Amino acid sequence: MPGVYLEESDNFDVALRRFKKQVEKSGILSELKKRQHFEKPSVMRKKKKAAARKRLLKKMRKINMM
């Protein structure tokens, strides 16, 4: 669980920015969006395959550029 400890000299805006960065890094918001609606296992598999294909094509393009 992300948390930020403030000192007396810390600015609130800086602390808020650090907290947002920790939340983003931990993946809480993306997990929340993913779980907001039920997704059938078949749809999850399709998305996973599509993401893998996209990564592979990106890697192939990068290799061909060299």
Curated annotation (Swiss-Prot):
Source organism, top-level taxon: Bacteria
Q: A Gene Ontology CC term for this entry?
A: ribonucleoprotein complex
Q: What is this protein called?
A: Small ribosomal subunit protein bS21
The UniProt entry's GO biological process terms, in alphabetical order, are: translation
What Pfam family is a match, any one?
A: Ribosomal_S21
Task: Name the keywords, alphabetized.
Answer: Ribonucleoprotein, Ribosomal protein
Lineage of the organism: Bacteria, Pseudomonadati, Thermodesulfobacteriota, Desulfovibrionia, Desulfovibrionales
Does the keyword Ribonucleoprotein belong to this entry?
yes
Task: Please name the Gene3D superfamilies in this protein's record.
Answer: Ribosomal protein S8 (1.20.5.1150)
Q: Which gene encodes it?
A: rpsU
The family classification in the record reads:
Belongs to the bacterial ribosomal protein bS21 family.
Q: Which GO terms describe its molecular function?
A: structural constituent of ribosome
InterPro entries registered for this protein in UniProt: Ribosomal_bS21 (IPR001911), Ribosomal_bS21_CS (IPR018278), Ribosomal_bS21_sf (IPR038380)
